[in-house]
């Protein structure tokens, strides 16, 4: 019989199990490692059982598992920033026990920056996985003084963006909609505020971020390029506390505390911006007339009902309002809520049930002249799933489950405003269901070999009511070739697709500090964003697979070599990847995508490929840390002419909108003293592809008509930028209130990075190119942060 005892001090002996119980060959000790002050789980803590070679590292909720025979041991637990914990164990049977760590107390003066001796990059089975803790993100120089998940993510190998003000991020050259973004299980369709300058994730509530860009576990699906899984931390179940910050552009606040001490907690956070005063001081008249505002609210509650049952709920709401001069206004909002129930059965089975629902709405207002109007589109979803985790033996793990998404899309509604002459128009709602079953196996074959193999089967159905247009066979789809239509009733299946998605990863350890990893995964995408702009905008519509539009499919391959030096103080890797895409969606030249009742006439089907090399180097030495990553990648597309569609670029391969061959990030951090630090980040990338006029002809000596190049044959200027930050604090560490002050400078050397290029031509003169720089100047900021 297992016996769970209360926490003991380090000087006492901890007796686990019953001394008169039936002896077993192998005993199991499970539990969690927590912060003694606030009860927060500590992921990444290292447990070592002396005098054996038994080790474990806590997972995201602080859980661990150690297997040992009956005996007397010394358990050592260590984690960066905490006092090392040692306690003597007398183990007689299976047991469950939680251990508490205390923050490390350091006198003012020089401090050495060290990483926990973590060889997870070498020993983990998955390739192409990046984990970002909030501590790592806080070490980077910040835009307007605030830690930001998406900006930190863009310092990772293989991750780029279209430029300043871009909505989302691109992984290995993929589109922004090809990333599955989850926040505590909630689907996120637009992850940014202020048209891309801030992410919607409240930084003081984030526990950690994991990006899967190569090896993707079978429990994830629905996107071609990557999975971004953002986990929010649980509230303090020991005492009431709070933290926040006040900056020149936004402020934030988090409050947390126990609902029932040691059993249930809450945490709530809010952010709001006030950047209008900055716009009022701009040189541009249009900018002085502009307005920008956003807010977000996030709440989370967790409770342990019993030793084996836990429930939780997360909810968030965001709103953005941006008006450019007296011409156009954007509004977009997200609201979502998620519930989970976890049940431990015995010591080897963990069951989880989840349910969440959400909505994303965007509005575009034309506020100029006699054509004032409001364009609206909306996405609603309902999502649920069950999964089970089973570990029959120490070296084998099995996870299986099922989930379903139900989508309702309102692709567009146009309404006149203030008595304008705009003609109302509305597109009918679209509905679809996506049902998946998955099986995930992970097996430690030997000390040198670990294998992960999984399979995911997904079925998609597009549902009525819907009127499907039928086109003349053997010719391209146009409005002129419509011949008939089919009418489907409410809930009737209009189209269905399904497919198997195998997942495979292999790790072979070469030495104690090096390994080789192989990875393969297939993914289907049944829900895609329709946008032919340089960067997705809040009003771009999302399109379900249907009678005419097939799901996209990607096969991802990767191989990596991982090598650490000096007991993991230096970490390096080299990864090669290749992606093959089928049924890729592209667009005709000058395609009309908004309020199009037959959007399939503007779409083209092709194939794509992406390939590249990622190089990473990280070194901690003394008070300094240096990180470098470089990516070489190409992302190409091909749309060939056929009897049913036109081609692009004569059927040749051409660069995608996000093809940026070279990307380099350099990050430096200096812990000057315990209460002061300096950081600097430099980023460089090749300019995005663009299409440009190469010649022109004059009609009637009056009208000059430009002739454009093939698609994406030119590039805008290269992007590069240097940011720095200096932080003083925290001070008041011995008191209840702790403070810090950060001075940051974004774009230190005033680089006018081009977001896009446009062309103008005066009569009888050559074409002139002009760059559009969203942030073409230096941006200093000061931020006051506090904790209590």
What function would you assign to each model-found segment?
Residues 524, 581-582, 675, 684-702, ...:
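C-terminal beta-signal and adjacent terminal beta-strands/loops
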Residues 52-63:
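Short, acidic Ser/Thr/Gly-rich low-complexity loop/linker segments typical of extracellular
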Residues 302-319, 331-478, 570-578, 612, ...:
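Face-selective signature of the C-terminal outer-membrane beta-barrel domain
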Residues 577-580, 599-694, 785:
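Gram-negative outer-membrane beta-barrel transporters
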Residues 83, 95, 117-177, 182-216, ...:
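Periplasmic N-terminal accessory/gating domains of Gram-negative outer-membrane beta-barrel systems
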Residues 361-362, 408-419, 461-484, 508, ...:
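Surface-exposed extracellular loop regions of Gram-negative outer-membrane beta-barrel proteins
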Residues 11-22, 32-34, 40, 45-50, ...:
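Short, acidic, small-residue-rich periplasmic hinge/interaction motif at the N-terminus
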